[in-house]
From Swiss-Prot:
Pfam families cross-referenced by the UniProt entry: Squash
Subcellular location, principal: secreted
A GO MF label: serine-type endopeptidase inhibitor activity
Protein name (record): Trypsin inhibitor 3
Length: 29
């Protein structure tokens, strides 16, 4: 999957860019 390496806070996968997923840490990865 393609995930830009940008630190983004999230609550759900839809908060993240491209194919990033929302990790348990509360950040996209």
């Amino acid at each position: 999957r393609i995930c830009p390496r940008i630190l983004m806070e999230c609550k759900a996968d839809s908060d993240c860019l491209a194919q990033c997923i929302c990790e348990e840490s509360g950040f996209c990865g």
